[in-house]
Amino acid sequence: MREIINKLNPIIIDKADKKFGVSRILKKYDGKPVYIKDVNGFEVVGNLCSRETLSKIFNVKKEDFIFFMLDAMEKEKEGKLKINNKLKEKYIVEIPENIKNWPIPIYYEKDAGAYITSGVVVVYDKDYGYNLSIHRILVKDDYLVIRMVEQRHLHFLYNKALKEKGYLDVAIVIGVHPAVLLAGSTSADITFDELKFAAALLGGEIGVFELDNGLLVPEAEFIIEGKILPEVDDEGPFVDITGTYDIVRKQPIIKIEKLYRKEKPIFHALLPGGIEHKTLMGMPQEPRILKGVRNTVPTVKNIVLTEGGCCWLHAVVQIEKRTEGDGKNAILAAFASHPSLKHVIVVDDDINIFDINDVEYAIATRVQGDKDIVIISGAKGSSLDPSSDLKNKLTAKVGVDATMSLIKGREHFERAKIPDK
């Protein structure tokens, strides 16, 4: 963790309070790495993951990161777990009640309490193997409450475990390499091993060690070992990716059995609704959308989920247009690949999809509203969109074909250039 922090040359802050103090700083410097020397006696880091910082950490160009992830996903089965139980000797073991001493922030004024937001949840199933995922986790006295989205993999494995033995063994790792964060944020088939995927992102291998409950975990600054129980408690309100409050629900309780921390650990605070949150939610979805669009429009070049769309609701798709209709086909394929998408813009390969002004230029000069806009009413949308029909999870989806008309000819849209010499 320290090596990564030093590589990013963070903004250094001397001290902050864990109640609103950490979040004020992370909000002020949103998108820029921040290192706080003292929060309740611990070091804290935040704003670690953005497109720019991840490109620096993995030494991959921003526009090529989607292909880097796609390549690692295809090599997931080749990822190796290097078991080194001596890693466990680095940790101080604490009682469950000591979690109140950890620098876990309260981020916003209406939050239900202190929340773990960067914790990667590790579980194992004998039929499906290891599963990694990121969930918001509310701290309540000496136990936790986890927001578990229905019908996602963890929810399925949790219900399976309840039927088999009445609980699900769990580990929560905090302060991990961004490869583990990306792996935990990736949506794939339930048989996809996110630990091996993290290994693939790191070049083929990742060090792990075994906890007392038998789970293999990657090295982290803080670790919580416990059980997810059938009992539930109130979870929320809490701020989600759109910067608005999510509702209160009854969610599963995690019984803390053991706490681990390094001698001088660094806590990773992830600001809800901040750029880091959006990046980790969105970037791992982009390879999946690219693959889906490629099946329909093989000449797709790149895809980005935009920050303005919370890296979840808006996509810009870049294609090399070969025939009329490619743009609309790409729109439909993108919606099918990521059902949470609300608006999709398809552009030509001369448009820089990472420059929103260039995307807007394509809309201004290549779109006729009565011909190039697709509206789909009553489609399944995202529960994170406060404007949608939240009860039925329905929304209107809009696709904009901002590609050049081949009937008019590309020369009609030629952009003027100034020679280098």
UniProtKB/Swiss-Prot annotation:
Give residues annotated as binding Mn(2+).
N131, E194
**Flavoprotein is among the record's keywords:** yes
* InterPro entries named in the record: UbiD, UbiD-like_C, UbiD_Rift_dom
Q: Supply the EC number(s).
A: 4.1.1.126
Q: In which pathway does it act?
A: Isoprenoid biosynthesis; isopentenyl diphosphate biosynthesis via mevalonate pathway
Q: Under the cellular component aspect of Gene Ontology, which terms does the record hold? A: cytoplasm
Q: Where does the record place the catalytic residues? A: D240
Q: Which GO terms describe its biological process?
A: isoprenoid biosynthetic process
Supply the enzyme class, top level.
Answer: lyase
Domain of life, source organism: Archaea
Keywords, A to Z, come to: Decarboxylase, Flavoprotein, FMN, Isoprene biosynthesis, Lyase, Manganese, Metal-binding
What GO MF annotations does this protein's record show? carboxy-lyase activity; metal ion binding
The entry sums up its family as follows: Belongs to the UbiD family.
**Function text:** Catalyzes the conversion of trans-anhydromevalonate 5-phosphate (tAHMP) into isopentenyl phosphate. Involved in the archaeal mevalonate (MVA) pathway, which provides fundamental precursors for isoprenoid biosynthesis, such as isopentenyl diphosphate (IPP) and dimethylallyl diphosphate (DMAPP).
Full protein name: Anhydromevalonate phosphate decarboxylase
Species this protein is from: Methanocaldococcus jannaschii (strain ATCC 43067 / DSM 2661 / JAL-1 / JCM 10045 / NBRC 100440) (Methanococcus jannaschii)
